[in-house]
């Protein structure tokens, strides 16, 4: 009987030896650094008011180790979240928000970037939800099967875990416009439980701004009367990356535009950019963005969007040169039409291996409309006037694009 109780204890309580321990927590003027004795797979940060605090939940970890304060942080407290992991609470001496973060050292180090703000901005940011960080590596044995914690499994591990069933075929959205016109599908990035990037200035969420921008683009295009338009989502819902371009292909779209807001640790980073597909990133920032956006599906608790290297190669092989050239041509048109209307980065046309652009026969771009982490860009993205300028730029570019294609036939 004793051995059965021991086995039940391990099964329902998790194996203590598999948990990662928090070794050290250090705070400086503009960042928090948390170190672990073994790799950690995921964490999430969020803000709490009355009193002002930053909370960080770490999946599969146990509290412990050294801690120090500094900068805006007056105190550090660690505790357990049952079988789900550890929580670190940072008591603030002055308001500060989380502007970004990342894992390094193979999951053994988490760096969270901080920025001081005024009390009103902190209060607004408390409504923004969680900012999530992931390494893509976690030992499955560290989290009990019954746990509600999201699990991201190392692809090299030889373990079996239960995953949510795939959703059935998603309903196709409404198409608006005259039936004889070419179809443009506009994809508002993120949505549902995935907020995307969050403004440290206003607490605005990327998922809300992209939906407003997509609706403005739709309305501008319909007013022009030259194309039909459909939105992949017209409400706050989550779509996996393949569903987004699959909707466009099933509808027979002639052009796909995915709308996003960029974010960077540097608060001075500013300007819109336009991405087209390439397996080789055009620069380091393009590679960073691809890594961030391609992980969007992981937020559902399992990486439904992950493809093997072989499948990824097949997709690229299938992508016709004509399609990639058409995408690049539209990107240049959009940049031209946005000049003087929407602030652009000097090298606004970039290339990256973005999953949402991998439809093999559909010209596609990802439009980063500005930096939500930059105060001026965020104000523009949140304003009706700013969205109108973006939408009119898209309308002009779309109309020229299809006029040229008609003339070339």
Language-model regions, residue ranges each:
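Flexible glycine-/small-residue-rich
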Residues: 36-38, 58-60, 92-94, 113-116, ...
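Short, solvent-exposed loop/turn elements at domain surfaces
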Residues: 43-45, 65, 193-197, 375
